[in-house]
């Protein structure tokens, strides 16, 4: 039980909860009110599809996602809460149930860090639907992905009615602002389709950057529409730092 507030005594309140110091100052009985502490449950969905294997000059996107997944789970289990993991590509591949403790965290970390981005195409619907069933009693669902698929918004809305949702889009700098390196053959790792693009053209790079910005803004709007949050992750930056900064901003916002 966690202390919440002190309020005037009303008939039916337990005498053992009377705050005698406040009662003496106020001149009439006051009681302490407690709120039941609920165990936090965190489920991380980690995208292990082929697009996650992309790596420019930094580490592969799946490495960044795996590090974020482990960091989130470590923060939860450190406080005695439960954490779980689903890895997926076009379907759920690995399931680590919701548990706590250092041994469980080690098992979860091994599962996350063993991902190589070698799966098939991306489908967010199966893991989101499984998360909705698993987390029916509420909790936090964090999704680490590059979100390179369509058709999952309605499933996310259903999840958002039950849980707090955290979207962690993973981006490589070259995907956001490609360097002017001339002709580049760009290949979709999931479909195999490729296209020759002239990255030395300012117009091409501007269109590319505009499209990347548009995807980021769309994802932010999606999260806000369900009361969720977005923590952008970049492969050339520390994922743990990004997550810590997010929660520090949230804590400051609650204090104002």
What is the predicted role of each segment?
Residues 5-13, 22, 31-70, 74-256:
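Exposed, interaction-prone extracellular/peripheral surfaces
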Residues 16-26:
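N-terminal low-complexity, intrinsically disordered segments
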């Amino acid at each position: 039980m966690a202390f919440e507030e002190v309020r005037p005594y009303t008939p039916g309140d337990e005498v053992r909860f009377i705050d005698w110091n406040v009662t003496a100052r106020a001149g009439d009985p006051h009681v302490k009110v407690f709120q039941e502490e609920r165990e936090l449950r965190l489920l991380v969905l980690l995208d292990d599809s082929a697009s996650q294997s992309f790596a420019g000059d930094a580490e592969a996107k799946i490495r960044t996602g795996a590090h974020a997944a482990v960091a989130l789970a470590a923060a939860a289990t450190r406080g005695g809460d439960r954490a779980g993991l689903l890895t997926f590509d076009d379907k759920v591949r690995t399931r680590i149930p919701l548990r706590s403790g250092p041994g469980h965290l080690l098992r979860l970390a091994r599962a996350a860090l063993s991902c190589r981005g070698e799966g098939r195409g991306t489908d967010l619907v199966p893991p989101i639907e499984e998360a909705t069933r698993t987390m029916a009693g509420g909790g936090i669902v964090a999704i680490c992905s590059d979100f390179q698929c369509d058709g999952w918004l309605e499933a996310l809305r259903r999840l958002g009615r039950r849980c707090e949702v955290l979207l962690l889009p993973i981006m490589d700098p070259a995907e956001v602002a490609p360097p002017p390196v001339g002709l580049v053959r760009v290949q979709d790792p999931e479909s195999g389709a490729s296209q020759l693009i002239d990255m030395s053209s300012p117009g091409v790079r501007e269109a590319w950057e505009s499209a990347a910005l548009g995807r980021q803004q769309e994802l932010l709007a999606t999260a806000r529409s369900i009361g969720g949050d977005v923590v952008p992750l970049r492969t050339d930056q520390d994922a743990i730092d990004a997550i810590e900064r997010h929660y520090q901003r949230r804590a400051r916002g609650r204090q104002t």
